[in-house]
Amino acid sequence: MAIRYIFGRAGRGKSYLALEEIKQKLQEEEDNKLFLLVPEQFTLQAERDLIRKQELTGMMRAEVLSFTRLAHRVFSEVGGLTRVPINELGKNMILRKIADESLKELSIYQSIAKQDGFITKLNELICEMKQHDITPTELTMELNEIEEETILKRKLEDITLLYQRFNNYLKGQYVDNEDHVNLLIENIERVEFLEGAEIWIDGFQSFTPQIIRVIEKLAQKVANITITFTMELNAKEKDKDLFHITQKTYLKVKTIAQKFNLDEEVINLDIEERKVLPKEKEIAHIEREFNTYPYKQYADEIANLEIFAGSNLYSEMENVAAQIIHLVRNRGYRWNDIALVSGGLDQYSMILKRVFEEYHIPYFIDEKRSIMNNPMIELILSSIEILSRGYQYEDVFSFLKTGFSDLTKDEVEQLENYVLQYGIRGKAYSEPFTKGFEKKQIQQKDKEEGEKQIDEEKKEKYNELRMRFIAPFAKFEKRIYRKKKIGEITKALFEFMKELNIEDKLNQWIEELREEKYFEYVNENTQIWNKIMEIFDQLTEILADESATLKEYGRILEAGFLACKVGVIPSTIDQVLVGSIERSKSHDIKALFVVGVNDGVLPFGQEDGGILLDHERESLVKKGISIGTTLESSLLEEQFMIYSAFSKPTEYLWVSYALADQEGKAMRQSILIDRFKKLFKNLRIKSDVVNDVDRQLHLITTPISTFKYMTENIRQNVDDKAMADMWWDVYDWYSKEPTWEDRRKLMVKGLFHQNQITYIGENKAKSLYDNPIKSSVSRLERFANCPFSHFVTYGLRPKERKEYQLSNPDIGRLFHDSMEQFTKEMVNEEIQWKDLTKEKNDELVEKVIDEMVPDFEHGIMLSTHRYQYLVTRLKRISKRAMWTLTDHVKKGEFVPMGHEIIFGLEGDVPPIIIELANGEKIYLEGRIDRVDLLNDEEDGNYVKIIDYKSGSKEFSLSDVYYGLQIQLMVYLDAILSSEEKKHQVEIHPGGIFYFKIDDPMVKTTEKVVEEVEKEINKKLKMKGLVLKDVNIIKKMDRSIGRSSTIVPAGLTKDDEISKSSSALPEEDFKALLNHVRRLVKEIGEEMLKGNVKIEPFKKGGDTSCKYCDYIAICQFDNSFHDNQYKNIKELKSDEVLERIKKESQKKLE
């Protein structure tokens, strides 16, 4: 019996020698077993290497195993495994159950124990403790020695509690991977196949105490053990840190040899004549000097090392791809001669896939993938949540959108639209859908019979979809009714999946993926059913008789899924191997690309997110309890890992980093880059920031990738920027390739694309817009804001998906409707405004809103507590608003003439008719919230227009001038015209106002109610324009003084209108009305000419794009020459009037 040690620095050929020795042993006529033991994640690569090494017809005597697999081999021969084995999935589910049940007893971890990530961390910690032979008893003893009440002590109390309960749960019934190893230790001496066997252990930097005990047992059983150590046997002082962990591991193994008096043999590959794998000089220099202090500098010219700085992550990966193509084409490399590693593979993974596919580089990403985003897992978890949470929208459509339900994609979208529009959830799914199909809606007087029939058909369709969705759930719910055992729920869940025919649907989907050549996803999804069944098996094996609510069951199941990873097998051998730097184990490679060498990525930033922090682990080490790695050992391991990676290739090393991330935020280079600069005197960092011709030439690789660069460069040429002549040669190549003809033409068209269209023509405009044109004021204002926005709204007419929620316009409509109904109630009860009391005001508001709420938007106001509170708030605001308006009436002489007055072809008041130059007419229509009238024998007849606003609205004459705010003027015009014709008397404008519906908060030191009310009334003062006539103003507010609390006006002590008042004489009112009519005519004519120009206004810092829903459609970009704002200047009132007068004069001339 002997232990052999193979020593050598990275890349000296230790693994190569081990494989050579196994090959030679296989050629001998012996029957003893040969085993190569490697870390679990490297078994596949080691098997490949072993097969590739052999030139024999068979290798039955040789096996590649991990220590876990060795345990299974032992148990298959001698038995000894009387307990049920559980994997990481089972452990996670048990720990989730234990943590949930122990929540009230936990101290530090009570809140975070509910989080998903906690169970994974707890599992890792328990694994570490078992691997280091630490029991709950030892932790308890340590706790007894800690007298003071520290956070560490409280943490250890929680950990000990959970660890002990976990062990108690397993005791006598179940065995995990760590217990497997302990059982392996107990059974090694009983195994016959290890008699006379030879073992090679390769690829380990260190061994846990548990594995050291395995090696100790093996050393007493097998003929000999050979262990490789990546270290220099007689390391100099400057290298001792680098090999510190390996040195400690070697000394532990050596102790075993000495303890049992075993023969020892040392093979040192660092001796010149034993070197088996020659490397290029640059790589050899990195291996020798990268981690040494002091170091030797490399002064020769550099041919096989490149450091590259990409302008961003994507650019970095594009240059990597171009260099890989270069190596394959110009240096004769095969794809599998190349590997790529990164410290931040998650950050690069999606970019890498896109770029490598664009460059036609075959690749394999060596990673264990989480199954949490797989649609099968989404289906199972959402199914549980549908029942446990009561058919919430998110759960229902997470389930339906997996593609495994019995509804098609179109049907899911139809059902989703209905559910969102009418707020369907909970019990509503178990009853026929009726919302939107109520009798009073279907039988509206303006509905045709055909529409009624369509409604009935829709109702039947939606209910048919509802039944097809809910039927399997009804059976599932029935099966688990009053069932509390996890085994029973799991069985019901499996039956539910069978009923949905999930396995066949999954296989069908896999075939579709295979046909579309998505082999990566084929590989993943062919494993998913077995993984799910494995989790179900673990549940029924270890938790079947445990009780759980459906919600708890879902959390336990999710914990199992979180622990589950799938490994994807390479689809071909000749491809670039991609992996994370910490777990990547490749065959012998010629070229290595190390990407993402940025600060915090490589070396890794300090992650201190475990259950025990680094300083707490250090504290335990001082007390003799070593739980896994400490910060110091982690840094040493990382140093060794980086050293191993940089030393891996034999011919070429590329190291790159990004100067910015995908969002453009600056990124710093790693300290490793500075190290390279010091080691290599002639090193020059290349970059694509300086885009020289050589760098551009380097990127001309494949037709797909090059096409993009060609387009970018020709775009620069079109924009009068410098471009290398070679790009015209590239363009010439594409122009001669028939397969690229269509894309080339599209590219040329795109280069000269103008993001603008001005007119679509009169005929198209007439076909788009209904004739005769009946226009609202808001439509005209939208055109004035931007013709294209008007075209989309009233021409294309896109519809937003309706959702069961209140928007600001809905709330505004509710206010308007309630105020309209309020006035109707006053009429019904024959109450005059001047007679209305505060009590009656509040009573009517309560009544009106209570009657409106149940039917408003299908009862949305009663659907949640939040909306029910909003009803209370709406009542409060409405009471304040109505009482304020009542107060206005009481303080003035104007009397409300009408509310919600409709002017239009079918309205109470005729429309405003504007005749256009081509003979067409525009009929202006609208609804006026309130019109007040003053009939005075001395002063005449005056009208006051009030528009209610639920939000803030300032009145601006400048906006009126530009057509952005013509609503009040049009309303005034409609009333003046109709009333004068109707009564054959002259009607004068009294004022136009916005009234904000609000119950504002005020800051005041006053405690007298009347004074507070006065402050509130100031806040509710109407905004707009009043006639510049003292008598009329006083008849709007008899109590007016220096400032009115009703209208935007005030009087001086001489009883004159103050300068701060928003007031105009009647002739200016008329001038404004005429100007608005001219504007309407101009807008109408442009509308019918087909003006759809993308031309939003810009006024100061404000633009009409700010609240526009169509910015994604027009794609307006001010940096384009043909996309420019219509700049308008903010005008003062006198400037507006002066311009209007000048324009009127020109018209007359």
Swiss-Prot record:
Query: Which domain of life does the protein's organism represent?
Result: Bacteria
Signal peptide boundaries: none
Other comments on record? Despite having conserved helicase domains, this subunit does not have helicase activity.
Gene assigned in the entry: addB
Parts forming coiled coils? none
HAMAP family from the entry? AddB_type1 (MF_01452)
Annotated protein name in UniProt: ATP-dependent helicase/deoxyribonuclease subunit B
Which coenzymes or cofactors are required?
A: Mg(2+); [4Fe-4S] cluster
Native source species? Alkaliphilus metalliredigens (strain QYMF)
- What does the UniProt function comment say about this protein? The heterodimer acts as both an ATP-dependent DNA helicase and an ATP-dependent, dual-direction single-stranded exonuclease. Recognizes the chi site generating a DNA molecule suitable for the initiation of homologous recombination. The AddB subunit has 5' -> 3' nuclease activity but not helicase activity.
